[in-house]
Curated annotation (Swiss-Prot):
Keyword Cell division appears in the UniProt entry: no
InterPro entries in alphabetical order: PSII_PsbK (IPR003687), PSII_PsbK_sf (IPR037270)
Signal peptide extent: none
Maturation propeptide residues: 1-24
Organism, as annotated: Solanum lycopersicum (Tomato)
UniProt gene name: psbK
Function: One of the components of the core complex of photosystem II (PSII). PSII is a light-driven water:plastoquinone oxidoreductase that uses light energy to abstract electrons from H(2)O, generating O(2) and a proton gradient subsequently used for ATP formation. It consists of a core antenna complex that captures photons, and an electron transfer chain that converts photonic excitation into a charge separation.
Name of the protein: Photosystem II reaction center protein K
Pfam families membership: PsbK (PF02533)
Its membrane topology: Single-pass membrane protein
Highest taxon of the lineage: Eukaryota
C-alpha cells in the first residue's frame, strides 16, 4: 500500500517539475508544423467517437 502511494507521489512530482516539457516549443525548422502538433492530442478522441458513430450505423448489434 505504501509503495503505491509513493509511486503516485513520484509520478506527480515528476509531472509538476517537467511541465515545461509538455509546453515546449518546436525548433524553428519545424515551426510550420505547429498547427498539426496542436491537433495531434485530439486525434484519439476522434477514433473513440468514430466507434459510437459506427455502432449507431449498424444499430448497436
Amino acid at each position: 500500500m505504501l509503495n503505491t502511494f509513493s509511486l503516485i507521489g513520484i509520478c506527480l512530482n515528476s509531472t509538476l517539475y517537467s511541465s515545461s516539457f509538455f509546453f515546449g516549443k518546436l525548433p524553428e525548422a519545424y515551426a510550420f508544423l505547429n498547427p498539426i502538433v496542436d491537433i495531434m492530442p485530439v486525434i484519439p478522441l476522434f477514433f473513440f467517437l468514430l466507434a459510437f458513430v459506427w455502432q449507431a450505423a449498424v444499430s448497436f448489434r
